[in-house]
Regions:
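Sparse, context-dependent recognition of short Cys/His-centered cofactor- or disulfide-binding micro-motifs
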Residues: 5, 9, 40, 61
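A short acidic/basic microdomain associated with nuclease active sites
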Residues: 29-57
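Feature for intrinsically disordered/low-complexity regulatory segments and propeptides
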Residues: 1-23, 32-34, 193, 198
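Intrinsically disordered, low-complexity regions enriched in serine/threonine
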Residues: 58-234
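Generic, low-specificity signal for short hydrophobic/alpha-helical stretches with a mild N-terminal bias
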Residues: 2, 6, 37, 116-119, ...
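Short, well-structured alpha-helical interface segments that form or flank functional binding sites
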Residues: 15-26, 48-52, 71
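Compositionally biased, low-complexity repeat tracts
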Residues: 5, 43-45, 96, 100
């Protein structure tokens, strides 16, 4: 369009989507992932300067509890305005409510600055570890529906993520009560209340929705250690 997207440093190396996405998909094919029925969803924001591509793998479905299945999901992010590092992230997709479930393992995210030293091979090597990270996390999450959490702990977690935003705290509390009616006052209800907000809460500017969801997911990812503390203490 000729419209300026951003001003970046002299060492910045723009990696076109037309280059990085096919490379990433070749890495998926060459990995140990079962790609039967794979689904791809592409979203963009900020005038197409930021791109999120999510791959969902139905053949890697795990039941957390009866009639509650999660599927492996891997996302790749790329930007033309220098705002995002190139990254790939491991997550999961909850079939029951269509929530994107973020994974907090430090090895679940690969990041690399846009520069001449961008190492695509290292990124694809991280992709090969994705299945193990996913399996490990699902094993832990199977405890969540069985782990009761107190109202005080729930309030601490929601206050941590909401800060001074009373509307956000109210939204999280409302989500939690909805999930409690299905799963009881458990860690699973807390996690789903958080990911429900990240995935489904309205955004002011629909054109930037992909970026907003990413920022919300980062907040949820930062809070996951608090949930793990509750699980371990149970």
């Amino acid at each position: 369009t000729g419209k300026r997207i951003s001003v970046v440093g002299k060492n910045y190396k723009l990696v076109p989507n037309s280059t990085i996405i096919p490379q990433f998909e070749r890495a998926i094919i060459n990995s140990n992932l079962n790609t039967d029925g794979i689904k791809r969803d592409i979203t963009q924001s900020h005038g197409n300067a930021r791109t999120v591509v999510k791959y969902t793998f139905p053949e890697h479905t795990i039941s957390i509890k009866d009639n509650d299945d999660l599927q492996l999901q891997i996302a790749v992010l790329n930007s033309y305005d220098g705002s995002w590092t190139f990254r790939s992230m491991v997550g999961a997709f909850r079939m029951l409510c269509l929530n994107g479930m973020v994974i907090g393992n430090s090895f679940a995210t690969y990041k690399k600055r846009h520069s001449k030293s961008l190492d695509i091979d290292l990124a694809t090597d991280h992709l090969r570890k994705a299945l193990g990270i996913y399996m490990q996390t699902m094993h832990v999450w199977k405890d969540y529906p069985k782990t009761i959490i107190s109202t005080d702990k729930v309030n601490i977690i929601f206050n941590k993520i909401a800060g001074d935003n009373k509307l956000l705290y109210k939204r999280l509390s409302h989500n939690f009560l909805n999930y409690v009616s299905q799963d009881g006052a458990t860690l699973w209800s807390v996690l789903n209340a958080l990911t429900d907000w990240a995935t489904h809460a309205k955004v002011k500017n629909e054109k930037n929705k992909a970026n907003v969801i990413l920022l919300r997911e980062e907040k949820v990812r930062a809070i996951l250690p608090m949930l793990e503390e509750v699980r371990r203490a149970a």
